[in-house]
């Protein structure tokens, strides 16, 4: 089987550590994503910053003085991939009470590893939607400065949510009086939280419009932020030049978020025909996490959470090890085109 080399050239563009001199790569095959054609024997030339300066047939390319092309004439090259739903500072093996023992600095260190794995898996741009303590902001800045190897990142910092909701931490008893950084109640408090996360470096705003699977005390399909709260968040974010992404499994929460002016809906697990029509009408992006369930197993989240997960997906396999879902939203997206559909993995890290 012909070797496929993912993101050959954009891989290097987004890794400042990789560059100090111009270079070139000779590709046996190169996917032209604009035309949809697979081109043969192409030369990709880039400058010292990693920016591509030319793509042309190898026979007609004159290389800059002193540049010797990397020979990948037995490989297929394609542009870098984009993942619009990641949590790179998280550990896929830490759920429930085990998360309480992980410090914010430790999550930042985990992010360094996951960013490297993500880039080497072929993803050169990611949107990170939800991280404790602005660890994703620090990771993004480290990558931009050339201190850390990783993809271009658009980050949200802490996700915004209601008290006791999916974006809160509900694991500690009442005497601790603990709540997550993004908790807000009411439209004005929600506006203030938008301003706060933008102040500390958020490129995008992440909110929880519905309950989730891995959070204690809520249900995946239950609405959380009200329509009025989400309208305030969207208005404030847009005023500050930021887009808003809403975690939403439930049918009603999906439609409320779209009506509120939210820019993208994450998961869309129980979207119905009306929700799809609303998304088309409002120009809302639907983001389906294609790899969320394979990330989870009985060993990592337990039977209880897997049972909750089964309420919002149609399992192809319900073995005690892994459950591979047929996400209803992604099927609906294909059937109800044309609407704006994007793919996120929900992955915390890619396999080595």
Q: PLM features: what roles do these ranges have?
A:
Residues 18-23:
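Boundary at the C-terminal end of the N-terminal hydrophobic targeting segment
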